[in-house]
């Protein structure tokens, strides 16, 4: 069983460095924005002591552990949802993952550039969160437009989808990410097909050690 986790954040905050630490991939991590363009991927076995014990009991010919596929995704910038900094391409890479590891820079070092020329972790978090939310709004607006064209068919499922989409659009418009919007299990099941980025589980990782190479 494999699980896909995207490593995201602003440019030059330590995403590739974290990716290297997790995967031992040794990919390029340089002190300039957009060091990464095409996503890097690495698969890591998940340690599980239970698997070791089961192996001793069952003695199978082969043991296949669960794995996590980490994806080092190029940095997003303000305006990414409008295509800034190849944003649409990078957002598409995030959409293909099942979870997000959001890397935030928390260290001062004049030798390591910051895309906004200042260290403000809270603002950096808000920029990424807002770009994911804006991307989801665009996705749902397109879905809404498409469903409205089919509404004359009288299909009840279309009305349910439109109602759920509207609920999420209202929340997203307030700056609330999809995973924090108050909804029930039926809503989640209906909205899943649209693969909203801000609905994915998100882990916040702070990069607080200023090594010489962060990207």
Where are these regions (language model features)?
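Extended, highly charged alpha-helical segments
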Residues: 122, 127-167
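Short gly/ser/thr-rich secondary-structure transition/capping motifs
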Residues: 52-54, 80-85, 183-188
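Conserved P-loop NTPase nucleotide-binding/switch module
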Residues: 71-75, 81, 85-132
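C-terminal-of-GTPase-core extension/linker across diverse P-loop GTPases
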Residues: 3-8, 13, 19, 148-204
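Conserved G1/Walker A P-loop phosphate-binding module
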Residues: 1-77, 88, 94, 100
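G-domain G4 guanine-recognition motif of GTPases
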Residues: 73, 105-108, 140, 152, ...
């Amino acid at each position: 069983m494999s699980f896909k986790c995207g490593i995201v954040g602003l440019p030059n905050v330590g995403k590739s460095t974290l990716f290297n630490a997790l995967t031992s991939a040794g990919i390029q991590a340089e002190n300039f924005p957009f060091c990464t363009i095409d996503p890097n991927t690495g698969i890591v076995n998940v340690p599980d002591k239970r698997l070791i014990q089961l192996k001793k009991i069952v003695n199978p010919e082969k043991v296949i552990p669960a794995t996590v596929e980490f994806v080092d995704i190029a940095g997003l910038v303000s305006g990414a949802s409008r295509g800034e900094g190849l944003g649409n391409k990078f957002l598409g890479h995030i959409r293909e993952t099942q979870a997000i590891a959001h890397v935030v820079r928390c260290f001062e070092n004049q030798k390591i550039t910051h895309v906004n020329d200042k260290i403000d972790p809270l603002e950096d978090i808000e920029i990424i969160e807002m770009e994911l939310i804006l991307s989801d709004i665009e996705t749902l607006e397109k879905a809404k437009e498409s469903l409205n064209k089919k509404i004359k068919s009288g299909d009840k499922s279309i009305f349910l989808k439109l109602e759920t989409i509207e609920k999420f659009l209202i929340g997203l418009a307030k700056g609330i990410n999809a995973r924090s919007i108050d909804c029930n299990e039926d809503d989640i099941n209906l909205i899943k097909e649209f693969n909203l980025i801000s609905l994915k589980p998100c882990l916040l990782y702070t990069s607080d050690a200023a090594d010489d190479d962060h990207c």
